[in-house]
């Protein structure tokens, strides 16, 4: 038997788009990049670019969220390099900062990308690859190339595609179904109503019926019994159709009652035409989304116009305009409390298992007040803490719109000797408007808020490029010089009402009950006579840059690339606003040394060194006065409480990396391995100073963060025949992140902490990875970590709480990240699937803390190891088992076991600690699944309608969470910070995509 291994058509001379739009042969690059094809990004109709990249790029960590948020998520390349996050605060620093997104040469945001137009994505991971982007490329770059018409030939094409998906919520939380609402205790009994003088006459019919504690928003009530009838809260409401109706004392709380089936309809139409001297393409997309939360939805609209032509010999002109419109209405929010648009998390943290949510869909009484399950008493319908979830859905209206206008114009002239000169202008215009109205909810005044943001970011760039070969084409040379000017302008305004509305339901700033004066004393602009406060602000930034790159190659085997850039930035001190940096990389195509090895198709070695600087946000160096409270008609102002170090220097990142890439066995097996080390020094941070200085903090250079890690990508085609093909790819990455030094006398820098129950903090600590977690309240333990038990006044052994010792409990940083994808083609059918995973990385769950503290969680019920009820009496073998030790008189400890009453343990002890609710964030999640049928050419030709290609696909996004170490929440949807404070419900989408090309 003779076995022949067919080679793959993988092109080893692929041309990729690198920094500043320069096109290079992939074999010549001395740094790590990863290109993802359109088919791997758009097969399931992902709505966001970052969602589509999840698990497909080695070293890229995807930080996502629920589909109910209509959010694009973000990616982080190679960990964090800063002690402050993207927004300038420390809280998100350990999560890392995002790369820049460059769409057809224009720096914009991931939110501005229309996935229907994406042709390819090239991810530049390190400073050596992104040095030509200057300060903005320090965290990597995602280079997006959109579809073009085929310039240089007569061509005309129309493409129509539609993706229709249905989205459902799925609930991770496991609730106990044995005990009801209130705080009576497991052995308690429901109260019995007896009519009395002063009660409504209609209540006489309710005499003798049972009810419970409606006001206590927990589930520590009596055991369920289907033989017992009781009056739910709504049964006391004479205006309700449920008046006087009893329910069985059983579990009625079903979280699925909170949601509806969402629908997303995405249609794209594109037209392209080209000839010898011109090309043009127009693309239009419209997407309407109905959310899984009632009264929620989103709109996405895109337009893309690309044209290029040659009016004169050697002169090429191109123009590109992209428009993006995004509107979100009542997108789910996350957080602890009742103000968020997230009744799901609210009910998981505080709720009653006996409540039938459907009874409260009609939440408005004839007098305009709201019904709720959480009334104060049967004769007081005022909500104790919580409104009907349907009131929250409908009486909070939170709408935001974002508009992106991305423009680029380019003119290039070809001179003799392969020299080209060009000029490019790009502009990224951004408009944001948010309107928030809240009416009549519990314990909250009616409010009207408006936020408005506008910005433009304009680049003017001149360039000279040269590309030639010498010495019988053995020596190749490329060079480019750029001069660039950037103007950035940002302005915003915030207007809030104060102390409620004069006329309920009239949401206008002029309808504010209170006058201005500012609940927010940090406002930095004039406060006027309307609203809670009226805050307006403007930021401007200018930068001048001169940079260039040179690439030399010998025998198509050896390559060296050098780049150099100097920036002058307006946000830095005059004496330090100029900074020079650059990079050097080398590559050798080692497979050319072993041409006799037929099994070795391609092998490259590479190494690089680079530096890149970063600047401040505008006005951080200025001592400015801010407007504060208004006293009558007199405005007040206060100075900046921060001391500014006038010698602040730019932050500098220095990076080294080495790597190799290969392809063997007829390009049937390929891989890429990379190791990097990255030091970021001169961190610009705010440190505390003594009160005698007259300031509260000091802005200064301090800190060195070191990132070291590796990235491995492997792929192969075990099967490749005419009718069968199987492709499999996987990647894994490890990043070791450490704070090496801080300012003299400093050993730690606070990154995050909870605003309530402030016993858990995240620090950047010298000698440890970023995001070290400490608690200041924990179980009291001996040196072996055993819980110490002591007798209370009743003589029962109880676990002790240590309120004085700071305890290290782990780190936020994951140990490994990666992904896996596969595609199987059988004739004209192709099955695709992709997953991503994370190993390690701690986070704290508020949801789990209050699931147990409120008695909702399944862990608070059931039986213990003695066969008794966890909520039963200790004397009857009930209670929660706690293993620990007791102290002996000689200072030693002996093992001991005790049982603690469930409410005392979960609500009085455990839920006052953070340590039990800090979890390993490891997970494996299937992100995409699709089955596509591509109509064969023979069938298309028989239709005689000009159809060039046609396909239909079954698609699914986020269909399964395959593995998780934590219950009740989804670790893949934490936002990358320390706390999960109340997740929006997880979603999965299923549907169909049809694609036609004429």
Predicted regions and their residues:
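A generic beta-sheet turn/junction motif
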Residues: 7, 125, 273-277, 286, ...
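Short aromatic-centered micro-motifs
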Residues: 101, 552, 780-781, 824
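Extracellular/periplasmic, surface-exposed regions of secreted and cell-surface proteins
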Residues: 41, 97-100, 300, 306-315, ...
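Short, small/polar-rich motifs associated with maturation and membrane association
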Residues: 1-304, 309-311, 316-318, 390, ...
């Amino acid at each position: 038997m003779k076995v022949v291994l067919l080679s793959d058509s993988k092109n080893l001379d692929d041309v990729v788009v690198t920094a500043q739009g320069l096109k290079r042969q992939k074999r010549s690059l001395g740094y790590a990049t990863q290109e993802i094809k359109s088919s791997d990004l758009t097969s399931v109709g992902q709505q966001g670019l970052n969602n589509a990249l999840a698990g497909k790029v080695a070293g890229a960590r995807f930080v996502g969220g629920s589909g109910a948020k209509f959010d694009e998520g973000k990616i982080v390349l190679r960990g964090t390099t800063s002690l402050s996050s993207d927004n300038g605060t420390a809280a998100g620093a350990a999560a890392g900062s995002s790369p820049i997104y460059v769409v057809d040469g224009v720096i914009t945001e991931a939110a501005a990308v229309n996935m229907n137009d994406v042709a390819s994505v090239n991810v530049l991971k390190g400073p050596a690859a992104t040095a030509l982007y200057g300060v903005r490329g320090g965290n990597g770059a995602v280079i997006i190339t959109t579809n073009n018409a085929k310039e240089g030939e007569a061509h005309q094409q129309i493409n129509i595609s539609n993706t229709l998906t249905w989205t459902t919520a799925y609930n991770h939380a496991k609730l106990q179904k044995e005990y009801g609402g209130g705080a009576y205790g497991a052995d308690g009994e429901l109260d019995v109503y007896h009519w009395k003088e002063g009660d409504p006459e209609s209540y006489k019919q309710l005499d003798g019926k049972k009810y419970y504690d409606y006001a206590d928003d927990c589930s520590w009530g009596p055991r369920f019994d289907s033989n017992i009838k009781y009056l739910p809260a709504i049964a006391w409401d004479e205006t309700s159709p449920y008046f006087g109706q009893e329910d069985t004392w059983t579990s009625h709380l079903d979280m699925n009652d909170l949601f509806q089936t969402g629908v997303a309809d995405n249609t794209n139409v594109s037209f392209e035409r080209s000839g010898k001297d011109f090309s043009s393409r127009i693309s239009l997309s419209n997407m309407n989304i109905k959310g899984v939360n009632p009264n929620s939805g989103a709109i996405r609209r895109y337009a893309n116009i690309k044209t290029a032509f040659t009016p004169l010999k050697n002169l090429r002109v191109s123009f590109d305009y992209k428009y993006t419109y995004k509107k979100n209405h009542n997108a789910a929010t996350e957080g602890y409390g009742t103000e968020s648009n997230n009744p799901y998390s609210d009910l998981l943290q505080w709720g009653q298992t006996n409540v039938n949510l459907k009874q409260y869909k009609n939440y408005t009484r004839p007098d305009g007040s709201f019904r709720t399950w959480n009334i104060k008493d049967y004769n007081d319908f005022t909500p104790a803490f919580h409104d009907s979830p349907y009131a929250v859905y409908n009486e909070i209206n939170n709408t935001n719109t974002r508009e992106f206008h991305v423009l680029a114009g380019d003119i290039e002239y070809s001179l003799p000797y392969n020299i080209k000169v060009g000029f490019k202008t790009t502009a990224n215009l951004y408009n944001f408007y948010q309107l928030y109205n809240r009416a009549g909810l519990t314990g909250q005044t009616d409010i009207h808020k408006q936020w408005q943001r506008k910005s433009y970011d304009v680049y003017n760039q001149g360039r000279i490029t040269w590309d030639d070969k010498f010495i019988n084409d053995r020596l190749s040379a490329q060079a480019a010089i750029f001069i660039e000017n950037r103007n950035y302008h940002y302005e915003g305004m915030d207007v809030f009402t104060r102390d409620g509305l004069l006329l309920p339901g009239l949401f206008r700033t002029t309808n504010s009950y209170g006058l201005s004066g500012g609940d927010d004393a940090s406002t930095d602009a004039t406060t006027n006579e309307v609203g809670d406060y009226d805050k307006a602000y403007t930021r401007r930034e200018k930068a001048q840059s001169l940079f260039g790159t040179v690439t030399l190659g010998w025998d198509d085997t050896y390559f060296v690339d050098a780049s150099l850039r100097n920036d002058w930035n307006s946000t830095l001190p005059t004496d330090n606003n100029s900074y020079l940096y650059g990079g050097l990389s080398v590559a050798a195509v080692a497979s050319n040394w072993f041409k006799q090895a037929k099994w070795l198709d391609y092998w490259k070695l590479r190494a690089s060194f680079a530096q890149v600087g970063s600047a401040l946000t505008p006005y951080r160096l200025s001592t400015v006065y801010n407007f504060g409270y208004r006293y009558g008609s007199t405005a007040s102002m206060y100075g900046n409480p921060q001391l500014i170090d006038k010698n602040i220097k730019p932050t500098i990142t220095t990076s080294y990396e080495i790597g190799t890439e290969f392809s063997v066995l007829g390009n049937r097996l390929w891989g890429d391995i990379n190791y990097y080390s990255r030091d970021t020094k001169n961190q610009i941070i705010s440190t505390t100073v003594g009160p005698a200085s007259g300031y509260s903090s000091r802005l200064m250079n301090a800190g060195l963060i070191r990132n070291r890690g590796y990235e491995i990508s492997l792929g192969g085609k075990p099967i490749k025949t005419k009718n069968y093909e199987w492709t499999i790819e996987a990647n894994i990455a490890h990043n070791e992140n450490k704070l090496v030094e801080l300012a003299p006398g400093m050993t730690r820098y606070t990154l995050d902490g909870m605003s309530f129950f402030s016993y858990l903090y995240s620090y950047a600590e010298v000698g440890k990875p970023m995001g070290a977690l400490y608690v200041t309240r924990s179980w009291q333990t001996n040196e072996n970590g055993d819980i110490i038990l002591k007798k209370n006044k009743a003589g029962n052994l109880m676990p002790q709480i240590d309120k004085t010792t700071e305890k290290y409990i782990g780190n936020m940083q994951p140990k490994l990240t990666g992904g896996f994808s596969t595609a199987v083609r059988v004739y004209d059918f192709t099955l695709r699937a992709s997953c991503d995973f994370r190993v390690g990385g701690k986070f704290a769950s508020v949801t789990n803390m209050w699931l147990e503290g409120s008695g909702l969680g399944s862990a608070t019920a059931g039986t213990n190891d003695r066969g008794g009820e966890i909520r039963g009496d200790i004397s009857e073998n009930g209670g929660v088992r706690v293993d620990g030790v007791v102290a002996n008189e000689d200072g030693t400890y002996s093992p001991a076991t005790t049982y603690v009453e469930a409410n005392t343990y979960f609500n009085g002890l455990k839920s006052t600690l953070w340590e039990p609710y800090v979890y390993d964030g490891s997970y494996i999640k299937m992100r995409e699944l699709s089955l596509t049928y591509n109509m064969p050419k023979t069938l298309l030709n028989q239709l005689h309608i000009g159809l060039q290609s046609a396909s239909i696909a079954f698609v699914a996004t986020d269909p399964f969470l395959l593995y998780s170490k934590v219950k009740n929440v989804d670790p893949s949807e934490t936002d990358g910070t320390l706390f999960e404070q109340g997740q929006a419900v997880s979603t999965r989408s299923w549907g169909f995509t049809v694609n036609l090309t004429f």
